[in-house]
């Protein structure tokens, strides 16, 4: 009996050394597991992007100089850029001193309007000195931190992604849907935000900053960029507005992907698509999704937000997607884009006749459009547009020059298509 008691006492002491926790309820154990997972995620996040959450990193003289070198590319012909670069090091030191002292570096905006695809857009451009500061903050803090929390199928204005990436992901999503169901029966919810930048609320935007920026000085600087626009909304033009607008509804994106477990979802800035098998389920998801958007102050465009049958095709990023019965995905340009290009070529012909443009410039613009169209199922559209360009300008810039060597002498000739 003494031996048994001694063994029991030893085990009890060992348990005490290891730490014996009191009896926990199911909810308490669930909370403890959640806290452990959260601490593990925070540690991984700190290892990945902890170095970017640093105010001094993006306000140093070297960071501002590098931001200036990146910001001046392609715009050195502007007077403001040239004047800044005449004394770039002195200007960088002055910006660093103001930021180190916590002073306001905002200088206001240049406001102008442009017409893009028939839409009148109000653009606000920054003074170049402030543009350099914001470029440094975006490169060294905002973009690496905010992009880390985005879903993979959100590729607007990010390095390595873009429109081509989004279109490829949409095609991949359709291929995955066909492999799962082996048909093209289903429904697509096409979503478009109305005046997205103008309707972004500041308080929800500040909540996004509070979740990601733990350095209080960096947090206050990013908030200052937003409050300079007025009571609500973000201005189109500053680089920080782009990454902020991308991350603004990211919480809803994760709700769709992680909580509702809907894989067939993609967002590109203010355009989104969501595919489901049942129309009734899609309507329920739509109503719940619209309620979440309303909490963020996001207003939907009633004309462009609609549910369509997958077999009829849908339009996303100016591209018409069709999932065929055999699993093939067709990508065709939308009709409006083709009409706009024909009108543009006719305008170029008028500019050439008036001496405002040379044929080479018109050819470069057309070849850019043509190269983009060659990635789509638009052979007939490209052929008809080639005929229109030849009839207007009497040249074929898409015909490449071939080079061969004969007895050490290069001979060039042009392929003549009949």
Tell me what each language-model feature is:
Residues 2-32, 126, 135, 225-229, ...:
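Right-hand nucleic-acid polymerase module
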Residues 109, 266-270, 302-303:
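Short Gly/Ser/Thr- and Asp/Glu-enriched loop/turn motifs at secondary-structure junctions
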Residues 168, 173-269, 273-292, 308, ...:
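Conserved polymerase palm-domain catalytic core
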């Amino acid at each position: 009996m003494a031996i048994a008691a001694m063994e029991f006492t030893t085990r009890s002491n060992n348990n005490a050394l290891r730490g014996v926790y009191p009896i926990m309820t199911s909810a308490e154990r669930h909370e403890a597991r959640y806290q452990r997972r959260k601490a593990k995620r925070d540690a991984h996040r700190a290892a990945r992007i902890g170095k970017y959450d640093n105010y001094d990193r993006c306000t140093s003289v070297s960071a501002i100089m590098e931001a200036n070198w990146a910001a001046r590319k392609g715009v050195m012909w502007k007077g403001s850029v040239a004047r800044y670069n005449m004394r770039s090091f002195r200007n960088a030191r002055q910006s660093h001193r103001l930021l180190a002292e916590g002073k306001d570096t905002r200088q206001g905006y240049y406001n102008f309007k442009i017409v893009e695809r028939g839409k009148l857009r109000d653009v606000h451009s920054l003074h170049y000195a402030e543009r350099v500061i914001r470029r440094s903050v975006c490169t060294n803090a905002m973009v690496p931190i905010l992009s880390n929390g985005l879903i993979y199928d959100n590729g607007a204005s990010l390095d390595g992604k873009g429109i081509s990436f989004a279109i490829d992901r949409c095609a991949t999503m359709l291929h995955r849907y066909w492999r799962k169901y082996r048909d093209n029966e289903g429904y697509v919810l096409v979503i478009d935000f109305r005046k997205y930048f103008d309707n972004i609320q500041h308080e929800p935007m500040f909540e996004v900053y509070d979740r990601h920026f733990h350095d209080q000085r960096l947090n206050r600087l990013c908030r200052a960029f937003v409050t300079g626009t007025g009571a609500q909304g973000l201005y189109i033009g500053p680089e920080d507005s782009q990454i902020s607008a991308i991350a603004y509804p990211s919480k809803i994106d994760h709700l769709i992907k992680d909580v509702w477990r809907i894989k067939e979802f993609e967002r590109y800035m203010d355009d989104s698509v969501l595919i489901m098998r049942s129309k009734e389920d899609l309507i329920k998801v739509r109503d719940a999704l619209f309620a979440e958007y309303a909490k963020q102050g996001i207003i939907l465009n009633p004309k462009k937000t609609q549910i369509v049958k997958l077999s009829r095709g849908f339009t996303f990023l100016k591209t018409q997607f069709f999932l065929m019965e055999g699993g093939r995905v067709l990508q065709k340009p939308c009709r409006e884009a083709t009409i706009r290009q024909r009108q543009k070529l006719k305008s170029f012909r008028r500019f050439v006749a008036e001496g405002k443009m040379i044929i080479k410039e018109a050819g470069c613009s057309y070849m850019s459009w043509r190269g983009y169209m060659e990635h789509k199922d638009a052979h007939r559209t490209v052929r008809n547009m080639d005929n229109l360009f030849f009839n207007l300008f009497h040249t074929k810039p898409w015909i490449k020059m071939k080079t061969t060597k004969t007895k050490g002498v290069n001979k060039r000739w042009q392929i003549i298509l009949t």
